[in-house]
Amino acid sequence: MSLTSTSKRLVSLDVLRGITVCGMILVNNAGACGYAYAPLKHAKWDGFTPADLVFPAFMFIMGVSIYLSLNKSNFDWRVSIARILRRTALIFVSGVSLKWILAFIATGEYNTLENLRIMGVLQRLGICYGIVALLAVTVRHRLFPTIIAVLLVGYYLLQLFGNGFEKCAGNIVSMVDYAVLGKSHMYLGGAQFVDPEGILSTIPAIAQVMIGFLCGKVIVGEKEIRSQIVKLAVWGTSMFVIGYLWSYAAPLNLSLIHISEPTRLRCIS
Protein backbone atom coordinates (compact mmCIF):
# COMPACT_ATOMS: atom_id res chain seq x y z
CA MET A 1 0.00 0.00 0.00
CA SER A 2 2.92 2.31 -0.65
CA LEU A 3 3.07 5.25 -3.00
CA THR A 4 4.90 4.46 -6.24
CA SER A 5 8.11 6.46 -6.68
CA THR A 6 7.40 7.50 -10.26
CA SER A 7 3.74 8.46 -10.35
CA LYS A 8 3.25 9.15 -6.62
CA ARG A 9 -0.03 7.25 -6.84
CA LEU A 10 -1.39 4.90 -4.22
CA VAL A 11 -1.95 1.71 -6.19
CA SER A 12 -4.21 0.10 -3.58
CA LEU A 13 -6.47 3.16 -3.66
CA ASP A 14 -6.64 3.05 -7.45
CA VAL A 15 -7.59 -0.64 -7.29
CA LEU A 16 -10.34 0.05 -4.73
CA ARG A 17 -11.58 2.95 -6.85
CA GLY A 18 -11.70 0.70 -9.93
CA ILE A 19 -13.59 -2.03 -8.06
CA THR A 20 -16.05 0.55 -6.74
CA VAL A 21 -16.65 2.02 -10.21
CA CYS A 22 -17.30 -1.49 -11.56
CA GLY A 23 -19.76 -2.05 -8.73
CA MET A 24 -21.48 1.25 -9.51
CA ILE A 25 -21.86 0.28 -13.18
CA LEU A 26 -23.37 -3.08 -12.24
CA VAL A 27 -25.78 -1.55 -9.73
CA ASN A 28 -26.89 1.34 -11.96
CA ASN A 29 -27.25 -0.87 -15.04
CA ALA A 30 -28.66 -4.04 -13.53
CA GLY A 31 -31.29 -4.49 -16.24
CA ALA A 32 -35.05 -4.30 -15.82
CA CYS A 33 -35.81 -3.03 -12.32
CA GLY A 34 -38.25 -5.84 -11.59
CA TYR A 35 -35.85 -8.56 -12.67
CA ALA A 36 -32.50 -7.31 -11.41
CA TYR A 37 -30.29 -9.72 -9.47
CA ALA A 38 -31.21 -9.27 -5.79
CA PRO A 39 -27.68 -8.37 -4.55
CA LEU A 40 -27.64 -5.53 -7.11
CA LYS A 41 -30.71 -3.91 -5.55
CA HIS A 42 -30.53 -1.46 -2.66
CA ALA A 43 -32.18 -2.40 0.62
CA LYS A 44 -35.60 -0.75 0.80
CA TRP A 45 -35.08 0.42 4.39
CA ASP A 46 -33.20 -1.36 7.19
CA GLY A 47 -30.48 -3.83 6.24
CA PHE A 48 -28.03 -3.70 3.38
CA THR A 49 -27.05 -5.54 0.20
CA PRO A 50 -23.77 -5.55 -1.78
CA ALA A 51 -25.22 -2.65 -3.78
CA ASP A 52 -25.22 -0.56 -0.61
CA LEU A 53 -21.43 -0.83 -0.36
CA VAL A 54 -20.78 1.32 -3.43
CA PHE A 55 -21.53 4.83 -2.18
CA PRO A 56 -19.87 4.35 1.25
CA ALA A 57 -16.77 3.08 -0.56
CA PHE A 58 -16.66 6.27 -2.62
CA MET A 59 -16.89 8.30 0.61
CA PHE A 60 -13.99 6.35 2.09
CA ILE A 61 -11.93 6.80 -1.09
CA MET A 62 -12.60 10.53 -1.01
CA GLY A 63 -11.31 10.73 2.56
CA VAL A 64 -8.05 8.98 1.69
CA SER A 65 -7.66 11.16 -1.41
CA ILE A 66 -8.16 14.36 0.62
CA TYR A 67 -5.23 13.43 2.83
CA LEU A 68 -2.99 12.54 -0.11
CA SER A 69 -3.87 15.78 -1.92
CA LEU A 70 -3.53 18.22 0.97
CA ASN A 71 -0.42 16.51 2.28
CA LYS A 72 1.42 17.80 -0.80
CA SER A 73 0.97 21.38 0.44
CA ASN A 74 1.64 20.39 4.05
CA PHE A 75 -1.98 21.26 4.91
CA ASP A 76 -1.29 24.98 4.52
CA TRP A 77 -4.71 26.66 4.43
CA ARG A 78 -3.31 29.70 2.63
CA VAL A 79 -2.34 27.48 -0.29
CA SER A 80 -5.34 25.14 -0.23
CA ILE A 81 -8.46 27.03 0.82
CA ALA A 82 -9.24 28.66 -2.55
CA ARG A 83 -8.86 25.31 -4.32
CA ILE A 84 -11.04 23.58 -1.73
CA LEU A 85 -13.86 26.10 -2.07
CA ARG A 86 -13.66 26.05 -5.86
CA ARG A 87 -13.74 22.26 -6.03
CA THR A 88 -16.61 22.05 -3.53
CA ALA A 89 -18.71 24.45 -5.59
CA LEU A 90 -17.83 22.68 -8.84
CA ILE A 91 -18.85 19.24 -7.54
CA PHE A 92 -22.11 20.53 -6.06
CA VAL A 93 -23.13 22.53 -9.14
CA SER A 94 -22.20 19.59 -11.39
CA GLY A 95 -24.53 17.36 -9.38
CA VAL A 96 -27.47 19.75 -9.63
CA SER A 97 -26.85 20.34 -13.35
CA LEU A 98 -26.59 16.63 -14.06
CA LYS A 99 -29.93 15.98 -12.35
CA TRP A 100 -31.51 18.75 -14.40
CA ILE A 101 -30.11 17.40 -17.69
CA LEU A 102 -31.08 13.78 -16.95
CA ALA A 103 -34.61 14.87 -16.02
CA PHE A 104 -34.89 16.64 -19.37
CA ILE A 105 -33.64 13.56 -21.25
CA ALA A 106 -36.11 11.32 -19.41
CA THR A 107 -39.20 13.51 -19.78
CA GLY A 108 -38.40 15.89 -22.61
CA GLU A 109 -39.42 18.76 -20.34
CA TYR A 110 -37.28 21.26 -18.49
CA ASN A 111 -37.53 21.11 -14.72
CA THR A 112 -38.17 24.50 -13.20
CA LEU A 113 -36.48 25.69 -10.05
CA GLU A 114 -39.73 24.93 -8.24
CA ASN A 115 -39.31 21.16 -8.54
CA LEU A 116 -35.58 20.67 -9.12
CA ARG A 117 -34.00 18.24 -6.66
CA ILE A 118 -31.31 20.06 -4.69
CA MET A 119 -29.43 17.22 -3.02
CA GLY A 120 -27.94 14.13 -4.63
CA VAL A 121 -24.88 11.89 -4.78
CA LEU A 122 -22.46 14.45 -6.22
CA GLN A 123 -23.90 17.17 -4.01
CA ARG A 124 -23.23 15.08 -0.91
CA LEU A 125 -19.73 14.28 -2.12
CA GLY A 126 -19.10 17.98 -2.66
CA ILE A 127 -20.39 19.02 0.77
CA CYS A 128 -18.46 16.28 2.57
CA TYR A 129 -15.30 17.07 0.61
CA GLY A 130 -15.53 20.76 1.43
CA ILE A 131 -16.15 20.29 5.16
CA VAL A 132 -13.52 17.59 5.71
CA ALA A 133 -10.91 19.39 3.60
CA LEU A 134 -11.49 22.65 5.49
CA LEU A 135 -11.20 20.79 8.80
CA ALA A 136 -7.98 19.19 7.56
CA VAL A 137 -6.30 22.58 7.04
CA THR A 138 -7.71 24.31 10.13
CA VAL A 139 -7.98 21.67 12.88
CA ARG A 140 -5.35 19.42 14.44
CA HIS A 141 -5.69 15.96 12.98
CA ARG A 142 -5.44 14.31 16.39
CA LEU A 143 -8.87 15.80 17.12
CA PHE A 144 -10.48 13.96 14.19
CA PRO A 145 -11.40 10.81 16.18
CA THR A 146 -13.16 13.01 18.75
CA ILE A 147 -15.01 14.90 16.02
CA ILE A 148 -16.06 11.60 14.41
CA ALA A 149 -17.39 10.30 17.73
CA VAL A 150 -19.30 13.54 18.41
CA LEU A 151 -20.86 13.50 14.93
CA LEU A 152 -21.97 9.86 15.13
CA VAL A 153 -23.20 9.88 18.72
CA GLY A 154 -24.87 13.26 18.25
CA TYR A 155 -26.67 12.02 15.14
CA TYR A 156 -27.77 8.88 16.99
CA LEU A 157 -29.22 10.96 19.82
CA LEU A 158 -31.10 13.12 17.31
CA GLN A 159 -32.64 9.97 15.86
CA LEU A 160 -33.30 8.42 19.25
CA PHE A 161 -35.28 11.38 20.54
CA GLY A 162 -36.68 12.42 17.17
CA ASN A 163 -38.39 9.21 16.04
CA GLY A 164 -35.50 8.82 13.63
CA PHE A 165 -35.77 5.09 13.02
CA GLU A 166 -39.27 5.03 11.55
CA LYS A 167 -40.18 5.39 7.87
CA CYS A 168 -42.73 8.13 8.31
CA ALA A 169 -43.24 11.88 7.96
CA GLY A 170 -42.69 12.26 11.72
CA ASN A 171 -39.07 11.12 11.39
CA ILE A 172 -36.78 13.99 12.41
CA VAL A 173 -34.61 13.39 9.34
CA SER A 174 -37.70 13.71 7.17
CA MET A 175 -38.96 16.77 9.04
CA VAL A 176 -35.68 18.63 8.53
CA ASP A 177 -35.59 17.71 4.83
CA TYR A 178 -39.16 18.94 4.37
CA ALA A 179 -38.43 22.17 6.27
CA VAL A 180 -35.09 23.03 4.65
CA LEU A 181 -35.34 21.55 1.15
CA GLY A 182 -39.09 21.51 0.62
CA LYS A 183 -41.07 18.51 -0.60
CA SER A 184 -40.76 19.41 -4.29
CA HIS A 185 -36.95 19.57 -4.04
CA MET A 186 -36.57 16.13 -2.43
CA TYR A 187 -35.99 12.69 -3.93
CA LEU A 188 -39.14 11.49 -5.74
CA GLY A 189 -40.90 14.65 -4.67
CA GLY A 190 -40.79 13.59 -1.03
CA ALA A 191 -42.76 10.39 -1.66
CA GLN A 192 -40.10 8.36 0.20
CA PHE A 193 -40.39 10.58 3.34
CA VAL A 194 -36.62 11.09 3.53
CA ASP A 195 -34.11 12.19 0.93
CA PRO A 196 -31.32 9.54 0.75
CA GLU A 197 -28.82 12.40 0.48
CA GLY A 198 -30.67 14.80 2.76
CA ILE A 199 -29.60 17.36 5.34
CA LEU A 200 -29.22 15.49 8.65
CA SER A 201 -27.95 12.25 7.09
CA THR A 202 -25.00 14.27 5.75
CA ILE A 203 -23.68 14.43 9.34
CA PRO A 204 -22.61 10.76 9.53
CA ALA A 205 -21.51 10.96 5.89
CA ILE A 206 -18.94 13.57 6.95
CA ALA A 207 -17.73 11.12 9.60
CA GLN A 208 -17.34 8.48 6.89
CA VAL A 209 -15.02 10.72 4.88
CA MET A 210 -13.05 11.60 8.02
CA ILE A 211 -12.46 7.89 8.69
CA GLY A 212 -11.02 7.57 5.19
CA PHE A 213 -8.85 10.64 5.88
CA LEU A 214 -7.37 9.00 8.98
CA CYS A 215 -6.66 5.83 7.01
CA GLY A 216 -4.83 7.94 4.44
CA LYS A 217 -2.76 9.39 7.26
CA VAL A 218 -1.80 5.89 8.39
CA ILE A 219 -0.82 4.86 4.86
CA VAL A 220 1.41 7.90 4.38
CA GLY A 221 2.75 8.08 7.93
CA GLU A 222 3.63 4.40 8.35
CA LYS A 223 6.52 3.60 6.02
CA GLU A 224 6.47 -0.18 6.47
CA ILE A 225 3.66 -2.03 4.70
CA ARG A 226 3.42 -4.52 7.56
CA SER A 227 2.80 -1.70 10.02
CA GLN A 228 0.16 -0.20 7.71
CA ILE A 229 -1.67 -3.50 7.39
CA VAL A 230 -1.61 -4.21 11.13
CA LYS A 231 -2.88 -0.76 12.09
CA LEU A 232 -5.61 -0.69 9.43
CA ALA A 233 -6.65 -4.24 10.33
CA VAL A 234 -6.97 -3.28 14.00
CA TRP A 235 -8.99 -0.18 13.10
CA GLY A 236 -11.19 -2.10 10.69
CA THR A 237 -11.89 -4.90 13.14
CA SER A 238 -12.62 -2.45 15.94
CA MET A 239 -15.06 -0.48 13.77
CA PHE A 240 -16.80 -3.65 12.67
CA VAL A 241 -17.28 -4.82 16.27
CA ILE A 242 -18.52 -1.38 17.38
CA GLY A 243 -20.87 -1.17 14.40
CA TYR A 244 -22.16 -4.69 14.94
CA LEU A 245 -22.93 -4.08 18.60
CA TRP A 246 -24.52 -0.70 17.85
CA SER A 247 -26.70 -2.23 15.13
CA TYR A 248 -28.89 -3.65 17.90
CA ALA A 249 -29.79 -0.05 18.78
CA ALA A 250 -29.54 1.45 15.28
CA PRO A 251 -29.89 -1.08 12.43
CA LEU A 252 -28.00 -0.62 9.18
CA ASN A 253 -29.85 1.85 6.98
CA LEU A 254 -28.22 3.54 3.99
CA SER A 255 -31.00 6.11 3.57
CA LEU A 256 -30.55 7.41 7.12
CA ILE A 257 -26.92 6.31 7.63
CA HIS A 258 -27.41 5.05 11.17
CA ILE A 259 -24.31 5.07 13.35
CA SER A 260 -23.74 1.34 12.74
CA GLU A 261 -23.47 1.92 8.98
CA PRO A 262 -20.34 4.13 8.83
CA THR A 263 -18.41 1.87 11.22
CA ARG A 264 -19.29 -1.53 9.76
CA LEU A 265 -19.21 -0.64 6.07
CA ARG A 266 -16.06 1.49 6.39
CA CYS A 267 -14.18 -1.47 7.85
CA ILE A 268 -14.93 -3.38 4.63
CA SER A 269 -13.32 -0.60 2.56
Range-by-range predicted roles:
Residues 30-49, 102-118, 167-179, 184-195, ...:
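Membrane-interface interhelical loops and short amphipathic "cap" helices
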Residues 10-37, 90-103, 131, 241-246:
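Kinked, hydrophobic transmembrane alpha-helices enriched for aromatic residues
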Residues 2-75, 80:
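N-terminal signal-anchor module of multipass membrane proteins
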Residues 2-12, 65-83, 214-231, 248-255:
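Juxtamembrane membrane-water interface segments of multi-pass membrane proteins
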Residues 141-211:
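Long hydrophobic alpha-helical segments that form multi-pass transmembrane helix bundles
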